[in-house]
A protein has these predicted regions:
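Amphipathic alpha-helical segment used for protein-protein interaction
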Residues: 34, 113-160, 170
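Amphipathic, Lys/Arg- and hydrophobic-enriched alpha-helical face
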Residues: 27-50, 65-69, 151, 200-203
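A short, charge-rich alpha-helical start-of-domain segment used by transcription regulators
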Residues: 2, 6, 14-39
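Sigma70-family region 2
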Residues: 13-17, 40-47, 58-78, 96-98
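DNA-recognition helix of helix-turn-helix
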Residues: 147, 158, 164-167, 172-203
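C-terminal edge and immediately downstream basic/flexible tail or linker adjoining helix-turn-helix-like DNA-binding
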Residues: 47, 112-114, 178, 194-211
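Short, basic/polar amphipathic helix motif occurring as a linker/hinge flanking DNA-binding modules
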Residues: 46-53, 77, 94-126, 208-209
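Σ70-family region 2.3-2.4 aromatic/basic alpha-helix that recognizes the −10 promoter
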Residues: 31-35, 53-64, 75-99, 103-108, ...
Length: 211
């Protein structure tokens, strides 16, 4: 989901030399990935009042303004830094909207329906059966529906790490860095989340992933 790091490093070097075009190119290259990340996590109640594209624009504007600080002190890979800005923006937005509405939004943030259907189907297929009957299209739709429901029913930490691994396609080491965990701890959290997801989906069927 996130752009390759080699060209990103070249653009960061150019941005560090004061090239404004490089900063703009960095933002453009990462815009779609930020949009997907925001769509995955934007609460439906908030999404009814706030356009996701506005959130993305705010995140990229903040990143542009703070680019000098990042280039001088890159505490983490650029895409992880950018997604952290987006995550902080979403947390603040949900907090402000809860206060404005004077009501509680579910502590377990529900997924927006705009996340990648293909990624969800791929993971659902891994967790369930690998062989489809002749009514493949119907089964795939059923898998998607069941997977979306199961993912929504997970605890926030479990859902987050599955999104990071299967929607954002982050490696275990990237997840560990983003969550400030050791790599073994990140791996164990991911396996725990998969177990819980399989329990919801029904892990007693054949063809599930081993743990």
């Amino acid at each position: 989901m996130w752009p390759d790091s080699e060209q990103t490093q070249e653009l960061l070097a150019a941005a560090g030399n004061g090239e404004a075009a490089a900063v703009n190119n960095l933002m453009d290259r990462h815009r779609e990935a930020v949009r997907k990340m925001v769509n995955m996590r934007l609460d439906r109640a908030v999404a009814a009042r706030v356009d996701a594209s506005d959130v993305v624009q705010d995140v990229l504007l903040e990143a542009s303004q703070r680019m000098g600080d990042y280039v001088n002190n890159p505490s983490m890979p650029f895409h992880l830094w950018l997604r952290q800005l987006a995550k902080d923006r979403l947390i603040d937005m949900h907090r402000r909207h809860r206060a404005a509405q004077r009501r509680s939004v579910d502590r377990e943030q529900r997924l927006n329906v705009n996340y990648s259907e293909q990624s969800s189907l791929d993971l659902a297929g891994q967790l369930r059966d690998h062989e489809l009957t002749p009514a493949a299209a119907t089964i795939r739709r059923e898998l998607e529906t069941r997977f979306m429901t199961a993912l929504q029913d997970l605890a926030e930490d479990d859902r987050e790490i599955i999104l990071m691994r299967h929607q954002e396609h982050l490696s275990n080491s990237e997840v560990a860095e983003a969550l400030d965990l050791s790599q073994p701890a990140a791996g164990m959290r991911y396996l725990r989340a998969l177990r819980r997801l399989r329990e919801i989906l029904g892990s007693d069927h054949s063809g599930v992933l081993p743990v």
